[in-house]
């Protein structure tokens, strides 16, 4: 089978390399022509057919052509100006970026032909200083009345040789100051609570012995009451005396003294020691159900 001849395409490696070489050669030639015949950028015009920049200066004998890259290089490095090699320092020392920025803005304004813009700060109004007599009069009126009506403000301003606006602003500032003082006092009270109150507590026991004040002992004295019950003849007029002492008896103490009920014939533990007058005696032979 016969091999077909290899057709050269514009996308082959050789064509691409050849195209790059041609572009480099044309760029070098254009730069050489530009340095040989310097022409200002304003005399360049673009040929719409070829896409190249051509010189419109008829005084030039040799026309030249350049590319977009050449124009950009011309804008960054104008022809005829000495180029400072990188790494060198000028006699005036290091360049200050802030100074360069200011000089650039100034040159731009001058180039455009407009006036140089100078930023000036707005002038602040002078602060009104009140005399001591005026301050005392304003403080006295503020204690009497925190808010003033327009006629009252006008009258006070004329009396103190001030304007109504000055009096109005002074009262506003004074109200704000008093409000801030109240808030600060509230925060101080909340941050530092009041000291705890002392409460007097009576001492009941001291060194294992009861210790009562006379006033307390009067409330804990003996309780006496007379029994008004007269349904039984034997108990008529028998006083009931129950003494509640303030001292507590120990659990191991013996039985206390007999009460009048026990002495009358009733003991708290069981039957009476002897039958009473009108109560019939229980027969010994009768058993309980």
Swiss-Prot record:
Family from the record: Belongs to the NK-2 homeobox family.
InterPro entries hit by this protein: HD, HD_metazoa, Homeobox_CS, Homeobox_NK-like, Homeodomain-like_sf
Record's subcellular location: Nucleus
Gene for this chain: Nkx2-6
Keyword Transcription regulation applies: yes
Polar residues bias (residue ranges): 261-274
PANTHER family: HOMEOBOX PROTEIN NKX, HOMEOBOX PROTEIN NKX-2.6
Gene source species: Mus musculus (Mouse)
Keyword Transcription regulation attributed: yes
Alphabetical list of Pfam families matching this protein: Homeodomain
Protein name as annotated: Homeobox protein Nkx-2.6
GO molecular function: DNA-binding transcription activator activity, RNA polymerase II-specific; RNA polymerase II cis-regulatory region sequence-specific DNA binding
Listed PROSITE patterns: HOMEOBOX_1 (PS00027), HOMEOBOX_2 (PS50071)
Function: Acts as a transcriptional activator. In conjunction with NKX2-5, may play a role in both pharyngeal and cardiac embryonic development.
GO cellular component, one term: nucleus
Tissue expression: Not detected in any neonate or adult tissues.
Disordered as annotated region, ranges: 75-125, 259-289
């Amino acid at each position: 089978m016969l091999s077909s001849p290899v057709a050269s395409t514009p996308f082959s490696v050789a064509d691409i390399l050849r195209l790059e070489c041609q572009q480099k050669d044309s760029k070098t030639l254009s730069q050489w022509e530009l340095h040989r015949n310097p022409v200002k950028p304003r005399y360049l015009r673009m040929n719409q057919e070829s896409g190249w920049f051509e010189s419109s200066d008829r005084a030039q004998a040799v026309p030249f052509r350049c590319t977009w890259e050449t124009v950009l290089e011309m804008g960054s490095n104008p022809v005829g100006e000495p180029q400072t090699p990188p790494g060198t320092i000028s006699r005036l020392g290091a360049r200050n970026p802030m100074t360069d920025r200011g000089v650039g803005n100034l040159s731009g304004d001058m180039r455009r032909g407009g006036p140089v813009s100078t930023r000036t700060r707005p002038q602040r109004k002078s602060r009104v200083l009140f005399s001591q007599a005026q301050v005392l009069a304003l403080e006295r009126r503020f204690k009497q009345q925190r808010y003033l009506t327009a006629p009252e403000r006008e009258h006070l301003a004329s009396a103190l040789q001030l304007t109504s606006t000055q009096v109005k602003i002074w009262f506003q500032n004074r109200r704000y100051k008093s409000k801030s003082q109240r808030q600060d006092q509230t925060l101080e009270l909340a941050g530092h609570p009041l000291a705890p109150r002392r409460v007097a507590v009576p001492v009941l026991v001291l060194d294992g012995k009861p210790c009562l004040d006379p006033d307390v002992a009067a409330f804990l004295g003996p309780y006496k009451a007379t029994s008004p019950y007269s349904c039984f003849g034997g108990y008529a007029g028998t006083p009931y005396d129950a003494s509640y002492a303030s001292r507590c008896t120990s659990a191991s103490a013996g039985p206390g003294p007999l009460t009048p009920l026990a002495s009358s014939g009733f003991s708290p533990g069981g039957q009476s020691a002897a039958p009473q007058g009108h109560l019939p005696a229980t027969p010994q032979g009768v058993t309980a159900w």
